[in-house]
């Protein structure tokens, strides 16, 4: 039975993301200095984990430049793109590599998006799995009477471990 994977903010081809830091200002968000090395390591890790028939929801910011789109054909899986703020190319550019393009996706009581939902909207869905924030957290507003959290799972490819939600196979 195929597995379902969620990944976000791969930023293939993005030299600047190699300089992103965690909130401590000391630890790099990604271990690579060279974007080509980063891209190759992420492709290798992706294909070691994701099989051709697995479903992958990419939660946005897949590539930073048009040249990096050519990497997509090398990635295993039946891919769906939830568009992010850096996914700026024409739909046809992405349709060559993704079965479906979406603004968001609702699955098993969860909403998948690139940017986090406003906390007042969470009651409708229960769980929002999103990208976009990298090492940052969703701010908490005490007026809502609950704590909202955002955990950093951006580019789990760096540690060669994807987050698998096989239980949600569709």
How would you label these PLM feature ranges?
Residues 65-67, 89-91, 111-122:
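Extended catalytic core of nucleotide-activated donor transferases of GT-like folds
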Residues 3-11, 109-116, 149-151:
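Active-site-proximal beta-strand elements of phosphoester/diester hydrolases
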Residues 94-96, 102-104, 123, 136-151, ...:
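Flexible, gly/pro- and Lys/Arg-enriched active-site loops
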Residues 152-170:
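Single conserved hydrophobic/aromatic residue that forms the stacking wall/gate
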Residues 15-20, 124-125, 140-143, 166:
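Short aromatic-enriched loop/helix-cap "lid" or pocket-rim segments at secondary-structure transitions
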Residues 10-13, 112, 116, 126-137:
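Histidine-centered catalytic micro-motifs
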Residues 2-8, 12-106:
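Core catalytic region of metal-dependent phosphoesterases/phosphodiesterases
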Residues 56, 128, 154:
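Receiver (REC) domain switch-region micro-motif
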